[in-house]
Amino acid sequence: MIKARIWSGALALVALVSLPLQAAEPVKVGSKIDTEGALLGNIILQVLESHGVKTVNKIQLGTTPVVRGAITAGELDIYPEYTGNGAFFFKDENDPAWKNAQQGYEKVKTLDAQKNKLIWLTPAPANNTWTIAVRQDLAEKNHLTSLADLSAWLQKGGDFKLAASAEFIERPDALPAFEKAYGFKLKQSQLLSLAGAIRR
């Protein structure tokens, strides 16, 4: 597997400060469109329901911008999020705090409380680091052990197709960051954008 650390981010839950765990007010539980988001969202949903809390299922609502917009607009009460995304929520990508999970958590927790009245709950011991993986046979045949090797191989015309989420293809801290850092550019024909795709 070829991988590089771009942003550090612990998994935390974002909840509206006014989250009313009252039977009369169902808790609107959301998640992102990806499989991981759906799994985490369903865990939240089941935990709340097992404690007698009424819920509204908004699992797999959309991409990060869609879900973020929903919680800031009051359309969601809770969803799982990675602290590193705070860099983009607050247009503060160059702050070194985002490269440290604990510092990033403290920063986004403070900013969201002040600016959006959102509360970040205690983070889970999880990490969401963007990576690019290649098949073992491709790596062995072409001597690919790093992203620098992959870049050099691509620049020589290596036959490559990347399957990735729309977010990985679009977000500035994902594929565009890899392309910039390692000096390669994938053509549209080399990209297979998974569910919820936004073509570039």
Which residues fall in each region the model found?
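Bacterial N-terminal signal peptides
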Residues: 8-18
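Sec/Tat signal peptide C-region and signal peptidase I cleavage site
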Residues: 19-23
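Extracytoplasmic "Venus flytrap"
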Residues: 26-44, 59-63, 167-170
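Short helix-initiation/N-cap motifs at beta->coil->alpha
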Residues: 35, 57-69, 166, 187-199
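Short helices/loops that flank or line small-molecule/ion binding pockets
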Residues: 42, 47, 65-76, 92, ...
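Ligand-binding cleft/hinge of the Venus flytrap
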Residues: 44-52, 147-187
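Beta->alpha turn/N-cap motifs
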Residues: 60-64, 74-87, 104, 165, ...
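A conserved helix-loop-strand patch within extracytoplasmic ligand-binding domains
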Residues: 102-161
